[in-house]
């Protein structure tokens, strides 16, 4: 289990409370699909993913990105219990969707980039370290049900 200090929790929460989940979620998932095009195979039902502009403008990408980031909010509320928080999502992504767990790490790294672009100078090295620790812990929690 990962332990977060009070300072790390405060650093994560302070930015999260300022985040536009809908905007950042669509941007994060869109960026994942553009930068790592092999991840597109999990989103066949999303329609046109033929170019970066098609992906970033796709309403299904934006809607699912919001859903992903909304569930990430659960991580922030439950930083001391990530494994339990993501148990059902881990099972879904493992048993039904067959998502390569490496993709969780990629999405976490994309989220850190989104935070840096949105928050600029507020995204200090200390804040980045706290977020990097959180996205890594979430990726591990999501990969938990994999054999």
Swiss-Prot record:
GO terms for cellular component: blood microparticle; haptoglobin-hemoglobin complex; hemoglobin complex. Residues 3-147 form the Globin domain. Disulfide bonds: none annotated. It holds the Pfam family Globin. Red blood cells. It comes from the Eukaryota. Keywords: Heme, Iron, Metal-binding, Oxygen transport, Phosphoprotein, Transport. InterPro entries: Globin, Globin-like_sf, Globin/Proto, Hemoglobin_b, Hemoglobin_oxygen_transport. Heme b binds at residues 64, 93. The modification Phosphoserine is found at residues 14, 51. One of its GO terms (biological process) is hydrogen peroxide catabolic process. GO terms for molecular function: haptoglobin binding; heme binding; hemoglobin alpha binding; metal ion binding; organic acid binding; oxygen binding; oxygen carrier activity; peroxidase activity. Heterotetramer of two alpha chains and two epsilon chains in early embryonic hemoglobin Gower-2; two zeta chains and two epsilon chains in early embryonic hemoglobin Gower-1. The epsilon chain is a beta-type chain of early mammalian embryonic hemoglobin. Belongs to the globin family. This is Hemoglobin subunit epsilon. The gene is HBE1.
């Amino acid at each position: 289990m990962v332990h977060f200090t009070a300072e790390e929790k405060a650093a994560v929460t302070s930015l999260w409370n300022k985040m536009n989940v809908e905007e950042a979620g669509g941007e994060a998932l869109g960026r994942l699909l553009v930068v790592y095009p092999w991840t597109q195979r999990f989103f066949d039902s999303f329609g046109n993913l033929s170019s970066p502009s098609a992906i970033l403008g796709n309403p299904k990408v934006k809607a699912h990105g919001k859903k992903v980031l909304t569930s990430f909010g659960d991580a922030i509320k439950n930083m001391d219990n990530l494994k339990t928080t993501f148990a059902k999502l881990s099972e879904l992504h493992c048993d039904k969707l067959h998502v390569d767990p490496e993709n969780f790490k990629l999405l976490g790294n994309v989220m850190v980039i989104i935070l840096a672009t949105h928050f600029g100078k507020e995204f200090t090295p200390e804040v980045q370290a706290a977020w990097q620790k959180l996205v890594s812990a979430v990726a591990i929690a999501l990969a938990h049900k994999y054999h």
